[in-house]
Regions:
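A short, charge-rich alpha-helical start-of-domain segment used by transcription regulators
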Residues: 1-16, 20, 26
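C-terminal edge and immediately downstream basic/flexible tail or linker adjoining helix-turn-helix-like DNA-binding
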Residues: 1-5, 74-75, 134-135, 152-168
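Residues within the DNA-recognition helix of helix-turn-helix
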Residues: 10, 146-149, 153
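Hydrophobic-face residues of short alpha-helical interaction/recognition segments
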Residues: 14, 18, 55, 59-67
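Structural recognition of an alpha-helix C-terminal capping motif at a helix-to-coil junction
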Residues: 30-37, 49-61
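Arg/Lys-rich amphipathic alpha helix in sigma70-family domain 2
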Residues: 60-78, 97
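Acidic, proline/glycine-rich intrinsically disordered inter-domain spacer in sigma factors
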Residues: 75, 83-109
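Helix-turn-helix DNA-binding module
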Residues: 109-117, 125-142, 156
Length: 168
């Protein structure tokens, strides 16, 4: 598969993932460019079975490198810009969806890093568990534990914030 085909096939998914990590439209775009640049450099050298998981892993490492360079380990969440929403929604519904997604991502990012990354990859970006485990460099069972604990903590956080109502 050539780079142009990869770009058109995976740009949106990769952009959304990197936006959820960086919480900044411009940083996400820069990271997507960096990811595809790295892919260009290494694509022909490696035989890659699952290209989407590999691109997400490259993107994740580009984000880590960016964070280290900018010393933003504890960066606060900025306003989420440019999220693509369904065209058939009214502007009011789009605003509500964007606000709810923003609150959800803010809540996810309060979790420990491995738990938040596992939830972002599996639940928000719908990677299969084995793909997410590969991206994060974790054993599959370890990833499942992070997802379980993260979802449990996330439910508590969302209930406390009044976003999710307690059952019962």
């Amino acid at each position: 598969m050539n780079l142009e085909t990869l770009y058109s096939s995976y740009f949106n998914d990769l952009y959304r993932y990197l936006l959820s990590l960086s919480c900044n439209h411009f940083v996400a775009e820069e990271l997507v460019q960096e990811t595809f640049f790295r892919a260009f450099l290494h694509l022909e050298d490696n035989e890659i079975e699952n290209i989407k998981a590999w691109l997400f892993k490259v993107g994740y490492h580009a984000f880590i490198d960016f964070t280290r360079r900018k010393n933003k380990k504890n960066a606060l969440i900025e306003e989420i810009k440019g999220l693509e929403l369904l065209d058939n929604n009214t502007p009011e519904n789009q605003f509500i969806e964007r606000d709810q997604l923003s609150q959800l991502i803010q809540s996810i990012l309060t979790l420990p890093e491995k738990e938040s990354q596992a939830i972002l990859l599996c639940d928000l970006h719908q990677l299969k568990m084995h793909e997410a485990a590969e991206v994060l460099g974790l054993n599959l069972n370890t990833l499942k534990s992070h997802i379980y604990r993260g979802r449990k903590k996330l439910k508590t956080i969302l209930e406390k914030r009044g976003i999710l109502h307690e059952e019962g």
